[in-house]
Design a protein with these regions (language model features):
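Primarily residues marking transmembrane-helix entry/exit sites
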Residues: 17, 73-80
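Short helix-capping/hinge motifs at transmembrane helix termini and TM-loop junctions
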Residues: 15, 38-39, 69-73, 90, ...
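A helix-boundary/kink motif common to multi-pass secondary transporters
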Residues: 15-16, 46-47, 106, 140, ...
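Loop-to-transmembrane helix entry
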Residues: 15-28, 148, 152
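C-terminal ends and interior cores of transmembrane alpha-helices
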Residues: 56-73
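Substrate-agnostic recognition of the 12-TM MFS/MFS-like secondary transporter fold
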Residues: 1-6, 22-42, 46-61, 78-137, ...
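Helix-loop junctions on the cytosolic side of multi-pass membrane transporters
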Residues: 72, 99, 103, 148-150, ...
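Transmembrane alpha-helix termini and helix-breaking/packing motifs in multi-pass membrane transporters
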Residues: 7-13, 66-71, 127-156
């Protein structure tokens, strides 16, 4: 939901394909530059804690955008900085997440777990834009303007991280 809402916001603020591309680039750049370092850290430190930190940062970036939208203070540079920070969090959280999966299942179940993980990732790529569209439609139908509806999408996305964070905090895995 975040990516579609953020793309929409960038276009609403700038009406510029350049800034839309720059936003995507700045989110992907840290992933390209720091994922290998994130992998080393995931191998050396507690993966669950690394992943928790990543989720907290991503929740904070989404919540920051929601607050900026609420106060009508959001500017393009805010979005670009938050995109870079989100990319950094993903660069360190992604390897921790991927390396956590083998710790959660028996070795014989690992191929199925990897397949389910892949399915989950791709289903989320389809559902997220749909959720954003539904959020926009519901809020617009109830009298909210477009910025308020987009603000709701960012706030809902930030709150969705609470489920992941709670689950990770409850997770007790040996050999991390």
């Amino acid at each position: 939901m975040q990516i579609v809402a953020q793309n929409w916001l960038v276009l609403s603020l700038t009406d510029s394909a350049f800034f839309l591309g720059l936003d995507a680039f700045l989110q992907q750049l840290p992933i390209m530059l720091f994922t290998l370092i994130g992998g080393v850290l995931a191998d050396r430190y507690d993966r669950r804690r690394t992943l928790l930190a990543s989720q907290y940062v991503q929740m904070a970036t989404s919540a920051t955008l929601a607050v900026l939208m609420y106060f009508h203070a959001v500017q393009i540079w805010h979005i670009l900085v938050l995109s870079f920070v989100t990319g950094l969090a993903q660069a360190f959280g992604g390897p921790a997440y991927q390396s956590l999966v083998p710790s959660l299942v028996a070795k014989k179940d690992l191929p199925n777990a990897v397949a389910l993980n892949s399915i989950q990732f791709n289903v989320a790529r389809v559902i997220d834009p749909t959720l954003f569209g539904a959020t926009l439609v519901v809020f617009r139908a109830n009298g909210y303007d477009e910025p308020q509806a987009m603000n709701a999408a960012f706030a809902l996305n930030a709150m969705s991280f609470l489920v992941v964070i709670y689950t990770l905090m409850a997770l007790r895995v040996k050999h991390l």
